[in-house]
Swiss-Prot record:
PANTHER family, sorted: TRIFUNCTIONAL ENZYME SUBUNIT ALPHA (PTHR43612), TRIFUNCTIONAL ENZYME SUBUNIT ALPHA, MITOCHONDRIAL (PTHR43612:SF3)
Species in which this protein is naturally found: Escherichia coli O17:K52:H18 (strain UMN026 / ExPEC)
Pathways involved: Lipid metabolism; fatty acid beta-oxidation
Compartmental location: Cytoplasm
CDD domains assigned: crotonase-like
Catalytic activity of the protein: a (3S)-3-hydroxyacyl-CoA = a (2E)-enoyl-CoA + H2O; a 4-saturated-(3S)-3-hydroxyacyl-CoA = a (3E)-enoyl-CoA + H2O; a (3S)-3-hydroxyacyl-CoA + NAD(+) = a 3-oxoacyl-CoA + NADH + H(+); (3S)-3-hydroxybutanoyl-CoA = (3R)-3-hydroxybutanoyl-CoA
Region (3-hydroxyacyl-CoA dehydrogenase) location: 306-714
Alphabetical GO biological process terms: fatty acid beta-oxidation
Protein name, UniProt field: Fatty acid oxidation complex subunit alpha
GO molecular function: 3-hydroxybutyryl-CoA epimerase activity; enoyl-CoA hydratase activity; long-chain-3-hydroxyacyl-CoA dehydrogenase activity; NAD+ binding
InterPro entries: 3-OHacyl-CoA_DH_CS (IPR006180), 3-OHacyl-CoA_DH_NAD-bd (IPR006176), 3HC_DH_C (IPR006108), 6-PGluconate_DH-like_C_sf (IPR008927), ClpP/crotonase-like_dom_sf (IPR029045), Enoyl-CoA_hydra/iso (IPR001753), FA_oxidation_alpha_subunit (IPR050136), FadJ (IPR012802)
Keyword flag Transferase: no
Job of this protein: Catalyzes the formation of a hydroxyacyl-CoA by addition of water on enoyl-CoA. Also exhibits 3-hydroxyacyl-CoA epimerase and 3-hydroxyacyl-CoA dehydrogenase activities.
Amino acid sequence: MEMASAFTLNVRLDNIAVITIDVPGEKMNTLKAEFASQVRAIIKQLRENKELRGVVFVSAKPDNFIAGADINMIGNCKTAQEAEALARQGQQLMAEIHALPVPVIAAIHGACLGGGLELALACHGRMCTDDPKTVLGLPEVQLGLLPGSGGTQRLPRLIGVSTALEMILTGKQLRAKQALKLGLVDDVVPQSILLEAAVELAKQDRPSSRPLPVRERILAGPLGRALLFKMVGKKTEHKTQGNYPATERILEVVETGLAQGTSSGYDAEARAFGELAMTPQSQALRSIFFASTEVKKDPGSDAPPAPLNSVGILGGGLMGGGIAYVTACKAGLPVRIKDINPQGINHALKYSWDQLEGKVRRRHLKASERDRQLALISGTTDYRGFAHRDLIIEAVFENLELKQQMVAEVEQNCAAHTIFASNTSSLPIGDIAAHATRPEQVIGLHFFSPVEKMPLVEIIPHAGTSAQTIATTVKLAKKQGKTPIVVRDKAGFYVNRILAPYINEAIRMLTEGERVEHIDAALVKFGFPVGPIQLLDEVGIDTGTKIIPVLEAAYGERFSAPANVVSSILNDDRKGRKNGRGFYLYGQKGRKSKKQVDPAIYPLIGTQGQGRLSAPQVAERCVMLMLNEAVRCLDEQVIRSVRDGDIGAVFGIGFPPFLGGPFRYIDSLGAGEVVAIMQRLATQYGSRFTPCERLVEMSKRGESFWKTTATDLQ
């Protein structure tokens, strides 16, 4: 049976050809290799039509133009040559579109990303809607790749090399007005007139490319270009620590095209695309993409979720304010905050105001939309307005009696169907639900700070939580724009449990004489966004170390931290960034300066700060403990799958995405190698490095956690 066409041609009475893109049976338009023959057949008809005046590409999907190329195509390539051929096929197709003798216009509504933007760049003009769903970008770098269908060559010539490099190197997505300002699109119109406006543009001569700004013209010359690539190369190397080969290749390919001409540029682009597709970094990043897509589809349980019409929040602190913001402004749900202190409510409201006002200032949001979203948030010092809330999120202090009291109050003041979700980071959910009259409606919903930025949430059912409560809480987390993983109700849950030994080991190395900045730099070089000591300063030393006794009580001495160090630091009133006193020095607010370690830290912990370990040795000690604990969590069914374990670590603590998560990283090293490293470390530093039983068994049998493909588990 012949596949239904994703591209259909309709020539209007005014001799404008409208090519409608609608991939059958899919919510999103993505480009597949097999569509090339369909497009070529249409191009042949267009060339033969001597009456033709212009061509318009438009999508039939309600919220996307083309979301990119189908990533599975890359996974199907076995060699760099096959992936290179895929890129050349894309380049050729775009060249044929560009070579049409009449004006070709892309009418863009919704996401226009990756191969979708490359198709739009091959057109002679672009028009897009002013809808918030409309975004344009080349996100291939986030998959360890570069744009392979001409994007590295066309974009710099259209909008200037420095602006294009920023887009391609970061995967940054532009809104309609930004795209217009930069010259990426020729006009922005309401969705209702998009097609007609594009048709009118197609009836005119080809849109002439607007002159580049003076700065971009200077940077396009040999001297300016040399300076630009040197500066951008340095900045990129600092940011990626050399862990992402795609960024280096992007710079190389763009420079080749500008220095040697487009023909050499296209050759370099296709070759680099093929080689990058085979790198372990790209394979790991693609695996994270597939895993996060799967997690977002996972309902959490087999039961249907209950309706969600409104939410309540207990506690107007930093977490409560952040949760209120994502509930109202991302999920679009009315939210009511209860705090015993009116000041707490004011803080929570101000938090949302600050977030939204920032968007208004950056012109990402209209003032009227800011006001509409803020109107969804209200506050109270009692339970008025809570009677019919579907779900209550508790974000009060980490105190078991207080949280149990909150459960009792919610059961007394809210409806019989109301779910109680605790944002605890360390207390067992079963204990919080111990005196509940409806324990099946009590669950953990653990957000990470800052709430609006951290993509992960842990959903923690206790033994008596109902399947519907799980499904409803997962549904809310997704509405809030989060990636939820369901974890078992054991001390530390998953993320904090694997993070604690990593941070403990960093503190232990401090006591051995390693310097703060050396430890942090070693882990940043390894691929973490910040080092463990800086992370402790950011989350709060008091908050970050509070969980250690809980974990030590549950799992034994492998979780013990050098107690004298922690107490010495806390007794010196050092809580980190929040009180301006931590391991690092904090200047006046608003001043940006390079982080400096507070030299008073070393006498406080009784060392000179004269370390002996190399950066790889420092990283090895911290990371191996994290890997070992992640495997224990899988063994104890704290996480449901290695997929959830990898996603939890990457999205929850910034485990290096180019390594694919703890389980994929163990696979890349081999279980045998991990066991050998840990046994060596156990001999040197003690029994906390003893590899867990499952790793030892896997090393004997030569097993791995993942199969070879990006999405399959063993």
